[in-house]
């Protein structure tokens, strides 16, 4: 197809007229479409319905270490749930805390805790004149909503094909002690579907922050969300890299089963260094006696182990893959060669991002 920039004004006006007519035809159909991003379909939710049968009134709800999951206790989760999520997050079990149903909730609490009580003895952020966060863009709007909610100044960092602009990240983090963190979705990122390169992860692990309480908020939400068995992105494990680089405490790693089992009814986890986890437990001991152990046990008995999760995710992929391929086929057929936008073909996650030309975003959304 001929690029729009190579068409004459008359040709563009004629094209515009035809496209507007097509647009009116579609509008006249009165379609009611759920355009929510990252929301699993009913077919995907049905994949986990067997979980509802794993715990019945006649089932023993005692977990492996003898704790009765119906009762109080177990501040940081039952052992088998910690093992399941640890394997999914590629970290040792002892470096994991299991929380409730939402990793976003855990991230919110982590920022709130830093605001009110500081991190590992540092000054609470609320007592500082200025607190700043790096925000790779485009990124996850709910991450940015958290920092905005707490009045934290957000600094945009452009995304590249290999992750955030690390030259910019390194320069800012090393020179400004007011910068306390960065949001990251390192694998099949929201919304572009980019996975951080080896070099990007190495550079993150070797950051030299001016702030001793700087933390990388590593939201690995799509760690097992591949579309293909034979074509999968690989992401280096950040916790070990930080430890090898002499920065063991610099990262908080988050994940959950929200897009594996039931969104809103899954289990969430954080992985971090021993020192970070003990700092977090000091607040948790006041905040809660423990999270929902019955739900943790239900997940463990349904999936069994990491291999069960892997097999389960293949079923998700079978449902999602045709949808991704359809969108990509239509984009290429209708817009390929026109030079009016760009996109990538992700190997996993939930998103395809269309990057329009400068100045076009508002007009596109307005339609």
Features from the language model and the residues they span:
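Hydrophobic "anchor" residues on beta-strands that sit immediately upstream
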Residues: 181, 215-216, 252
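Conserved core of the PLP fold type I
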Residues: 67-212, 223-246, 320
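Conserved C-terminal alpha-helix-loop-beta "cap" of PLP-dependent enzymes
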Residues: 16-27, 276-277, 281, 287, ...
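Glycine-centered flexible beta-alpha turn that most often forms the glycine-rich phosphate-binding loop
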Residues: 219
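Conserved core segment of the aminotransferase class I/II
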Residues: 99, 240-321, 333-334
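Conserved glycine-rich beta-strand-loop-beta hairpin in the small C-terminal domain of fold type I
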Residues: 314-328, 340-356, 362-365
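Short catalytic/ligand-binding loop motif for oxyanion handling, primarily in non-cytosolic enzymes
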Residues: 41-46, 105-107, 143, 190-193, ...
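N-terminal "arm"/small-domain region of PLP-dependent enzymes with the aminotransferase-like
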Residues: 2-76, 80, 86-87
